[in-house]
Amino acid sequence: MWRQFALAVVVVLVLCYVPGYLFSRALGTKRTTSLVVAPLISVCLIGFSGIAIYPLGLRGVTPLLGGVGLFILIAAGLAYLIQKVRPTQENQSHANLGEKDSLNGVFLLVTAGISTAIFFVIFHKAIRNPSWFLQSADNYAHLAYITRSVQSGIYSMLHAAFYTGARPELQTPFFDEGFYPNALHSVAAVATTITGLNEVLTENVVWFVSVAVIYPVGICALLQTIGKKNLVASVLTSFVVFAQLAFPLRMVTVHAVFPNVMGFCAVPSAVVLFILMLNGAVPDKNDSAAEQLKSASFVNPRLVLLCVMGILALAMMHPSADFFWAICVLPYVLCSFLPRLTNFLQDKFTLSKTKGIALLAVMEVVTAGLAVGIWVFLLNTSFLAPTVNFVWEIYVKPLAAAQTVLNFGLLMNMPQILFAVAFWIGFVSCILNKNYRWLTLAFLMTAVIYVASLSDVLPIKRFFSGFWYTDPERTAAMVAIAAVPVAIIGMETSITLVFDLIKYVIKTVKEKGNKGEKTSSENSACTISANGDQSTCKPCMFIKNFGILMSIVAVVWGCVLLSPWNLASLPKKEHSEIRYGIIWLNEVFEPREHTTYKASEDEFVKKALQIVGNDLVVNNPYDGSLVLNSLYGMNIFYRAKVETEELPQSVIIRTKLNEVASNPEVQQAVRETGARYVLLLDLENPALLGDQSYYFSGLQITDEVPGFEIVLQEGPYRLYRITAVE
């Protein structure tokens, strides 16, 4: 099974990275930038291809990927034409605008390699079988979407559905169809079609790749764009991204909001795109006069296009990710871009310092006001009303909620002291450095949203956190993601200060020793040059290799952060917060006797599969059987709860099937649908909220009901053959 998991990981990585990378490179974007933004662009290309081929009547993976390839060819063609029209020098200045020396591919690969290994250990520890699934109503819906795409070849997010096009019309109980952000579902469905693996496994692989690769690489790239381009920061990133319980562990444990998880994981990469785009809009003071003149009038159109596609990709993953992205980039605009723009305009038009300050103040107020205006407008639009008016009834007093932010216990109220210490060191460091200052504002904004999401004042709750369903789990995840870069800076700053102090002490001792002795040929060879290259003694070799030693310390610190034991309680072995997160993740994925879809039910279903083959099986979705199509390919009738637009035969079957022996109307419905069997599992733990005995009164069948024959039974589980219509 784990070999199949590895195969699926490779396929999903190819789907997430190759199309986007080729498209970005076709536009002339640098290799490393193309690699970072590839998942966003790939999702956008797959999404638009799915929409484009639908009205053409094209179905399946081949037309979908063919459309993606066509978009790449169009991009390459346009880039070639532009290159021919413009002078070579102008093209070169546009190509490099905002990208020069911004990202280091080696450090990104280091982060990706270590983070993948770390999260695989976490994943394997919690989810011991990659075909286990999170047992929740939302996840059953996600799996139904994926299965429908696999069976129908339809990938349009404008026509998302549980059944339509997947089966014959008379075997399609519900016809509801509409918009749904299906990026995760499309990637999983394509991976299922290519590999032949089940939808449950490929769904797990998509969110695994998002968390293990896309998220850490995005954070590492973000740190590089603001100047933290070194091995220590890259190594720390691999550990710190998993050190906060609120994200990713809690987000993949509760609600089954996997599309939201995928979107949040891609936000750092989208922020990187935005920063690179704006970096080209205003020249750096450190650039030469010629470079400033070249870039003063232009914004890299390639990065603008990619940024727009990145924003659309976030919406295709989950629209709430776009609002989180906006929360992250607004502080960058206010704290970094606008001051640089003001300085540039001040120099260009020789404005006085007073006028420059006034200009900055006006631009800051206008930008902030515009942002608030857009926020209020969207908050009151009709298409977002179901989201922003949804209320999670979880309430915590503001001071108590703020305290959980300070100690990073967040919603679970389990303080993570080591993470908190690193963060607050980083917070001070960011305040003192103007290049990092915006990170603190982004964190504070997410913290306010989180505290507001726990408020018992509904207008406040709705205004601040409505775009995230007022869900404190999601807002806590945003706090964690916003805190990660700051915590990494705090750790890197601490390690650097310690090693700088050691380096200073060694140099001081050596210098004093050399002054008090005659210099021999051996001692003279031990002098310390500015870069340490001439050092040969042990202390000086320490200085020479302090970068490697710092990385080793970073690994040790990262291991401490992710320790399964609460270090404060040693020698007693108490679980750490991360260990609890792994335990909780296991509890919602592993089928047990207390879960909706039990281990014993799974054994019964495997036996039933040998009997039913491809025949249509009527089932009660409230007993957990609605996932069997995705898990084993069983041709079940109901893989979703009751929807609005329903097949007339479905209404008859779910309300009157137990009358099949004597009711001609029911017999006709059974014949028309082709139903042959009825599968009944345990209803003690209903999969979906609701009165199953009301909606599925026709499936209240016992061994004494005429018209059915028991073909398999174990305890309360039954597989009946419908004999009344034979």
Where are these regions (language model features)?
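Membrane-interface alpha helices of multi-pass inner-membrane proteins
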Residues: 291-319
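Hydrophobic, aromatic-rich transmembrane alpha-helices
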Residues: 340-343, 417-440
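Membrane-helix boundary/interfacial segments in multi-pass membrane proteins
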Residues: 7, 56-64, 129-139, 196, ...
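Active-site lumenal/periplasmic loops and adjacent helix-entry segments of GT-C-fold
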Residues: 116-265, 285, 294, 582-597
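Membrane-interface helix-loop junctions at the exits of transmembrane helices
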Residues: 45-49, 117-127, 152, 234-253, ...
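Perimembrane helix-loop-helix junctions
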Residues: 288-293, 325-366
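Extracytoplasmic
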Residues: 11, 17, 512-515, 555-726
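Membrane-embedded, hydrophobic transmembrane alpha-helices
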Residues: 1-101, 526
